[in-house]
């Protein structure tokens, strides 16, 4: 089906393709840029940035292993009491 058959004689026609402003040579040639890819900044090895080591932080050990359980139970109980008081 051609555009003439699709649109008929109603005066509707597809818009002509728009040309870029200024034609194909609109953008000026780039200057003062290296042509050969990316150079790493000075002070780093040629391979790029040094690999970072993961940091491990040791958590302090609780002296009473049951203390965390008690604290969790008390927190849950306090939360339930607060909800009961609100409703």
Swiss-Prot record:
Record key words, sorted: Cell membrane, Lipoprotein, Membrane, Stress response
Whether Oxidoreductase counts among this entry's keywords is no
Give the UniProt entry's GO cellular component terms.
cell division site; cell tip; plasma membrane
Q: State the InterPro entries in the record.
A: CYSTM_dom
For this chain, the Swiss-Prot or TrEMBL PTM comment says: Palmitoylated.
| Protein's UniProt keywords contain rRNA-binding | no
How does the record classify its membrane topology?
Answer: Lipid-anchor
* Major location category of this protein: membrane
**Where does the UniProt annotation place the signal sequence?**
none
* Low complexity bias: start-end ranges: 18-41
Please report what switches on or represses expression of this protein: By UV light, alkylating agents and heat shock.
Region Disordered, annotated ranges: 1-64
Any single Pfam family the record assigns to this protein: CYSTM
Subcellular location(s) per record: Cell membrane; Cell tip
Regions that span the bilayer:
none
What's this protein's family per the entry? Belongs to the CYSTM1 family.
Q: What is this protein called?
A: Lipid-anchored plasma membrane protein uvi15
What is the organism of origin for this protein? Schizosaccharomyces pombe (strain 972 / ATCC 24843)
């Amino acid at each position: 089906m051609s555009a003439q058959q699709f649109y008929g004689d109603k005066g509707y026609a597809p818009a002509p393709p728009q040309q870029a402003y200024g034609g194909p040579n609109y953008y000026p040639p780039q200057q003062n840029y290296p042509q050969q890819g990316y150079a790493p900044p000075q002070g780093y090895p040629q391979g790029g940035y040094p690999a970072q080591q993961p940091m491990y932080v040791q958590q302090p050990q609780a002296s009473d292993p049951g203390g965390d359980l008690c604290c969790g139970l008390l927190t849950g109980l306090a939360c339930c009491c607060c909800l009961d008081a609100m409703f």
